[in-house]
């Protein structure tokens, strides 16, 4: 019989916490079983394989991550939403490096995979933030990839203690967010119709007096 108190959800939560502690690449069913005080075969009554455990952790991570960003940007727009969302991502990766790594590595296994809905939560929050900059819809994917690349790189480097120069890391993060904000504002301006062009066309359409 499965150990009382263990469920697929509780095993997943325990695996996620352990991944944060020791690193996702060090997580195994055997190590998790030892942490939970059970024999490894007992875990397979709740989670069928190492791969399923990793996938469950990924779904949990992306759900938490999406909710963290959504809550951070609620009621904000423009640079305020950008800064809040970016800080939420930075904090999540720092606090949960193992489960974030699981989420970043996972891929959907089919159209009904809950990972798709979990990932959509993240994308929806970032998309809402970007629309505050009035970027053309066709350009949003490029902006999204830029955000992911920069913020993922910074957050994972920081979580791995990768910044060794004495310059304050918070100052660097603020500088990066300001830089992204200016870039997004410039992209929006670049794609807006020229007010001079509009006024000229209006003037041309006026009847001669």
Give short role names for the model-derived ranges.
Residues 149-166, 180-192:
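Amphipathic C-terminal alpha-helical segment
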Residues 39-41:
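Key DNA-contact positions within bacterial/archaeal DNA-binding proteins
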Residues 30-34, 43:
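Append "Primarily bacterial transcriptional regulators
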Residues 109-137, 141-146, 167-182:
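Amphipathic alpha-helical packing segments from all-alpha helical-bundle domains
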Residues 56, 70-101, 110, 123, ...:
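Hydrophobic alpha-helical connector segments
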Residues 94-113, 156-164:
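Amphipathic alpha-helical segments used for helix-helix packing
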Residues 1-6, 188-209:
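N-terminal intrinsically disordered/low-complexity leader segments
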Residues 8-16, 20, 25-26, 37, ...:
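An amphipathic alpha-helix adjacent to DNA-recognition modules
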